[in-house]
Amino acid sequence: MRVALVVDIVRQEEKLIAKALEKFQLQYDVINVAQEPLPFNKALGRYDVAIIRPISMYRALYASAVLESAGVHTINSSDTISLCGDKILTYSKLYREGIPIPDSIIAMSSDAALKAYEQKGFPLIDKPPIGSWGRLVSLIRDIFEGKTIIEHRELMGNSALKVHIVQEYINYKSRDIRCIVIGSELLGCYARNIPSNEWRANIALGGYPSQIEVDHKLKETVLKATSIIGGEFVSIDVMEHQSKNYVINEFNDVPEFKGFMLATNIDVAEELVSYVKNNYLR
């Protein structure tokens, strides 16, 4: 039984996963897709499971797809990565199944974005369908800021960045909630608190973690949403809403978990490797 740990940049999380694989005495290889090519051949089938960890969404997606072609079980699957990597696709799946999401309008041109701003009213959020760590997520307080954002986005080469997700601005309790699910189990949740010099709660932007109590509604919402998206190891960003209770804002298919471990004292890497061993390496 052998595991592939697929990376492009080795962060603390990947080091912890490797350490857990060694602790559980599982044979594994690290495949760095930023340095090594992945051929379409059956030789990759020597791996029973691949843990997909590239930072780049496209590297993660394509690595998962190539390994799947050789019969390798990937965590996460290319289908899951594709869904999580595009916020519009994520919202579409969730909204169809009745999962609360932020009120959103999709605008596919500059003119459409201006009309969406008018419909939504200020302040509002404008973000592209792709991206992580809060990049290009804009809080727009008036039409002048909005026009500036639209002009800048139009100059970007990637067509997806010219698509606008225009959303209500939610700032209830000045925090958001991040949860981690492994398999069908909610591992836990913690709050990401907005720092004084930011309006976003991302840990990468200075947000700081704290413990929270997970109530039944939060657990129910997160697990139902995860069953729709289909991820085996995902983090879910949740916002507390004054009228909707909990809304799902985003799924992450290659979850970072330093902040989660700090807030909850749960060893995520060991939980993940235990799940892999118990479900796929018996």
From Swiss-Prot:
Pathway(s) the chain acts in: Amino-acid biosynthesis; L-arginine biosynthesis
Top EC category: ligase
Keywords in alphabetical order: Amino-acid biosynthesis, Arginine biosynthesis, ATP-binding, Ligase, Magnesium, Metal-binding, Nucleotide-binding
Residue sites binding Mg(2+) 2 per the record: E250, N252
Residue positions of motif GF motif that is essential for ArgX substrate specificity: 259-260
Cofactor (UniProt): Mg(2+)
PROSITE patterns reported for this sequence: ATP_GRASP (PS50975)
Residues that coordinate or bind substrate: R192, I203, A204, E256, F257, K258, G259, F260
GO BP terms: L-arginine biosynthetic process; lysine biosynthetic process; protein modification process
Enzyme Commission designation: 6.3.2.-
Superkingdom as given in the UniProt entry: Archaea
Textual note on the cofactor: Binds 2 magnesium ions per subunit.
Region forming the signal peptide: none
Knockout or disruption consequences: Cells lacking this gene require arginine for growth.
Domain (ATP-grasp): residue spans on this chain: 91-277
Gene Ontology MF terms: ATP binding; coenzyme F420-2 alpha-glutamyl ligase activity; metal ion binding
Binding site for Mg(2+) 1: D237, E250
Record's subunit section: Homotetramer. Interacts with LysW.
Protein family membership: Belongs to the RimK family. LysX subfamily.
Cross-referenced PANTHER family: COENZYME GAMMA-F420-2:ALPHA-L-GLUTAMATE LIGASE (PTHR21621:SF2), RIBOSOMAL PROTEIN S6 MODIFICATION PROTEIN (PTHR21621)
Protein name as catalogued: Glutamate--LysW ligase ArgX
Classification of source organism: Archaea, Thermoproteota, Thermoprotei, Sulfolobales, Sulfolobaceae
Gene that specifies this protein: argX
